[in-house]
């Protein structure tokens, strides 16, 4: 999931005045949806459809709008604001191939600083700024000619999803009951994207450089820019400081510090009690037990039990003409090596589900998917025919396990070499997706993911959270504990 870079021309500044605002009781938020779609397209698509999963719309366009309204209602019940939140919504032909696609994106279309009710010299997303100010800060400002220049949030979703040239067969599921099967759950996807627009994003920091936006909202600058409202809550455990007190160079490094950036807001830290004990993989070798290894379960295949024997580990060797490890059907040598075992397969060149399915077809009983760069991975993908368990581990862990498998062989016989036996367990002293102090971690892979890095929860969280960089099939439409941590973070920044 991506949060798009906002238009710099949409950044706004309000000079604080000495006026006294009248206190008024907070009320439930109101969200209005403004369609950008022309007749016969997107929300206005007249294609007849059957009701699905509680969505009673009779046309494709109507069902799409019904999901928007359903998700907006969820946010309305969870937020308080005396100012209407406006969302510009449209369906567009976004980037696609037969095997991948941009699902959609959303973000705050305007950002504000120095308005009554906000922290001085701090950037806020528009919907939150309006709530804190108690007024619509764009009121009276002429539109920029687009028709949506003064909205709070702008969203766009891929109108071609599921067509042969656009992630073929994986269309949006428009039901409201979460039973998406192999389709993409549009309600969960939209709930996530509106979360970005409401403020789940560092928004005014360029993560590739660490630069902030200047007070005028006209450019990212190395020095002198204003911080995001997020920054005081972003604490780097390596640098031992928060982003508010970092240089641009330090923020750039922190954005690619795997498992190193924690969120310190009181609501989120309290809510992090919902996180489960850290799942670990134990590996017993002929000479002893390796240190516990963190893992993240794959999004496909059977659910991994908390405690279980996984099996004997194995490695594979490169095959002639392969595009990447495990990306083609296994040859005779690799099939013999992994039959009845758990191969360690490195990431790269094809989808995780493809690698696991090829291993399954060769007789594997499970798969460990090792990252090919530093940092954790939570293997995504979908294939209902995968019936063996799999999980993601770090590159360093994969290298250590491969070395252990090679070192174990001499401890057996030629007919039956020594093996490394893997099992699943948990570490009750640590929370999955949190640092040593129990503070939830942000997404900071070692290779920057523009639009995703920092502005999501980390992928090691368990249970899966709405604001991770991918939409997991087990998500509910809840934004608060005990299912989720989205609302606690939004409360930390002022909601």
Task: Report the location of each language-model feature.
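Short acidic, glycine/proline-enriched helix-loop-strand junctions
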Residues: 338-339, 372-406
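N-terminal signal peptide c-region/cleavage motif recognized by signal peptidases
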Residues: 23-25
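Protease-associated
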Residues: 269-357
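Short secondary-structure boundary segments
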Residues: 371-372, 490
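Bacterial N-terminal signal peptides that target proteins for export
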Residues: 2-15
């Amino acid at each position: 999931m991506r949060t798009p870079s906002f238009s710099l021309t949409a950044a706004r500044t309000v000079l604080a005045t000495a006026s006294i605002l009248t206190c008024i009781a907070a009320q439930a938020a109101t969200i209005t949806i403004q369609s950008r779609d022309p007749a016969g397209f997107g929300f206005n698509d007249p294609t007849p459809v059957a009701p699905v999963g509680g969505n009673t719309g009779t046309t494709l366009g109507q069902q799409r709008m019904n999901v928007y309204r359903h998700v907006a209602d969820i946010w309305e019940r969870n937020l308080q604001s005396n100012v209407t939140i406006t969302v510009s919504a449209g369906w567009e032909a976004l980037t696609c191939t037969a095997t991948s696609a941009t699902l959609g994106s959303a973000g705050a279309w305007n950002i504000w600083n120095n308005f009554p009710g906000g922290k001085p010299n701090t950037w806020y997303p528009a919907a939150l700024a309006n709530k804190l100010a108690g007024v619509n800060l764009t009121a009276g400002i002429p539109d920029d000619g687009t028709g949506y220049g003064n909205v709070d949030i702008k969203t766009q979703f891929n109108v071609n999803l599921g067509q042969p040239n656009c992630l073929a067969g994986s269309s949006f599921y428009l039901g409201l009951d979460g039973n998406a099967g192999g389709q993409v759950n549009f309600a969960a996807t939209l709930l996530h994207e509106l979360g970005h627009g409401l403020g789940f994003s560092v928004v005014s920091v360029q993560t590739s450089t660490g630069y902030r936006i200047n007070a005028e909202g006209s450019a990212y600058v190395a020095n002198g820019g204003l911080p995001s409202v997020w920054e005081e809550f972003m604490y780097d455990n390596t640098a031992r400081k928060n982003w508010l007190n970092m240089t641009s160079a330090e923020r750039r490094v922190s954005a690619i510090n795997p498992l190193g950036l924690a969120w310190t807001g009181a609501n989120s830290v309290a809510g992090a009690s919902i996180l489960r004990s850290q799942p670990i993989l134990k590996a017993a070798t002929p000479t002893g037990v390796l240190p516990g290894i963190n893992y993240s379960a794959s999004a496909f295949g059977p659910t991994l039990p908390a405690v279980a024997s996984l099996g004997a580990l194995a490695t594979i060797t490169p095959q002639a003409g392969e595009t990447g490890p495990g990306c083609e059907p296994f040859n005779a040598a690799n099939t013999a090596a992994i039959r009845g075992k758990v191969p360690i397969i490195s990431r790269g060149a094809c989808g995780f589900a493809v690698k696991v399915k090829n291993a399954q077809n060769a007789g594997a009983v499970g798969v460990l998917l090792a990252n090919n760069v530093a940092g954790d991975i939570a293997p995504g993908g979908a294939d209902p025919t995968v019936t063996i368990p799999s999980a993601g581990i770090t590159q360093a862990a994969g290298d250590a396990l491969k070395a252990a498998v090679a070192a174990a062989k001499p401890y057996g016989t030629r007919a039956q070499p020594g093996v490394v036996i893997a099992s699943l367990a948990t570490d009750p002293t640590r929370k999955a997706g949190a640092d040593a102090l129990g503070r939830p971690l942000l997404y900071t892979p070692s290779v920057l993911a523009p639009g995703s890095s920092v502005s999501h929860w980390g992928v090691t969280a368990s249970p899966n959270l709405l604001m991770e960089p991918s939409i997991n099939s087990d998500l509910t439409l809840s934004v608060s504990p005990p299912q989720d941590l989205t609302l606690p973070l939004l409360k930390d920044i002022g909601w």
